[in-house]
A protein has these predicted regions:
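Core catalytic region of metal-dependent phosphoesterases/phosphodiesterases
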Residues: 2-97
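Anionic-ligand binding region
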Residues: 126-155, 160-163, 178
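Structural motif
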Residues: 30, 56, 112-113, 142-144, ...
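Acidic, His/Gly-rich catalytic cores of divalent-metal-dependent hydrolytic chemistry
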Residues: 156-224
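Active-site environment of divalent metal-dependent phosphoester hydrolases
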Residues: 10-15, 39-42, 62-67, 120-122, ...
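Short acidic-hydrophobic surface loop/beta-edge motif
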Residues: 101-109, 155-157
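Active-site-proximal segments of metal-dependent phosphoesterases and phosphodiesterases across multiple
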Residues: 74-79, 107-139, 171
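Active-site-proximal beta-strand elements of phosphoester/diester hydrolases
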Residues: 2-10, 111-118, 162-166
Length: 224
């Protein structure tokens, strides 16, 4: 079975749709979103799309901050979590409050652990491409899939496959392409997928009020 993973859509419906389309083109039969469906792009358009399509989702640090009213007033103009919280309906708040911090699945005898951050700190720990994975060699899973860093990565070490999907909406790796990942549980082969999102993110920026730093970042993304 081909599983698809993406993360950190951060309220950008247009980029999320681009990521979902890319995964389906690569044959994904089941898709998972690994957290941070809100933040940076204010509103619920991405989260609502995930909910409508019944895509299994995890809770990320942005959902957790929104629910716990932990918005930092100094950072809120960038994260837009205050605005997003004020726009929330009871249905949206119930949905986001019920999201799990981790998810374990097994397919074709492949054990897969999904987290937003890391296996030991599912919400907040960053596992960058240069972070040692040795502390996670004893995790009870064959494949660990993460997000949070906005930097895509795939490594096969310690007898396991570690995948970071990167972000489908606000990539921070060189090149400025959105990213996601697929895993063929029949063969054990994992693959990163990259796709241009410049037009999509700028379209979203045109209809929303974004922080200058976010506007400047997406201005550098290549045309799509």
């Amino acid at each position: 079975m081909i599983l698809g993973f993406l993360s950190d859509s951060h309220g950008c419906f247009e980029a999320l749709e681009k990521g979902l389309e890319a995964l389906r083109r690569h044959g994904a039969e089941q898709i998972f979103h690994l957290g941070d469906s809100v933040g940076y792009f204010p509103g619920w358009s991405a989260a609502d799309a995930l909910r409508r399509e019944s895509i299994p989702c995890l809770k990320g640090n942005h959902e957790a901050m929104l629910l716990l009213d932990e918005q930092d007033p100094a950072k809120d103009p960038m994260t837009q979590l205050g605005t997003t919280a004020r726009q929330a309906s009871p249905v949206q708040l119930k949905w986001v409050s019920q999201l799990p911090q981790s998810l374990r699945i097994e397919q074709d005898n492949v054990r897969i652990l999904l987290v937003h951050g890391s296996p030991r700190e599912p919400l907040r720990e960053y596992i960058y491409p240069d972070t040692s994975l040795e502390p996670f060699f004893d995790v009870d899973a064959d494949v660990v899939v993460m997000g949070h860093t906005h930097r895509a990565d795939l490594r096969e070490v310690g007898g396991k496959t570690f995948i970071n999907t990167g972000s489908c909406a606000l990539p921070r790796h060189p090149g400025g392409l959105g990213s996601a990942a697929v895993l063929d549980t029949g063969t054990g082969h994992g693959e990163l997928i990259r796709f241009p999102i410049g037009n999509e993110t700028r379209k979203a920026a045109a209809r929303l009020s974004l922080h200058e730093a976010i506007v400047n970042r997406i201005a550098q993304y290549p045309e799509s």
